[in-house]
Amino acid sequence: MPRVKGGTVTRARRKKTIKLAKGYFGAKHTLYKVAKQQVMKSGQYAFRDRRQRKRDFRKLWITRINAAARQHDMSYSRLMNGLKKADININRKMLSEVAISDEKAFAELVSKAKEALK
């Protein structure tokens, strides 16, 4: 039986890796061995940072809510506690958007939270 080297399959696989490495600097986008390593590392970064992004956005929303709450003489933790006691269910993403875009509505939420804390 003749030897089968699988040239087209190997070429296609390598071509796919090089295509994934498009935009990388230096040898990382031209040489297969280096490109393969970088594509694998990039995949690890992407996996990790998809989770990190969720944490980063939550931190951003909390920072924005805290800044807006302090303009109304209230801390973030007291505001969230007051909203929970007032039975106002609004998530941090929406609350930060309200704090940025609609100052009157946010002031109303703060006043309801203050009433619930009394």
From Swiss-Prot:
One of its GO terms (biological process) is ribosomal large subunit assembly. CDD domains: Ribosomal_L20. The gene is rplT. One of its GO terms (molecular function) is structural constituent of ribosome. Keywords: Ribonucleoprotein, Ribosomal protein, RNA-binding, rRNA-binding. Disulfide bonds: none annotated. Binds directly to 23S ribosomal RNA and is necessary for the in vitro assembly process of the 50S ribosomal subunit. It is not involved in the protein synthesizing functions of that subunit. This is Large ribosomal subunit protein bL20. Belongs to the bacterial ribosomal protein bL20 family. GO terms for cellular component: ribonucleoprotein complex; ribosome. Signal peptide: none annotated. It comes from the Bacteria.
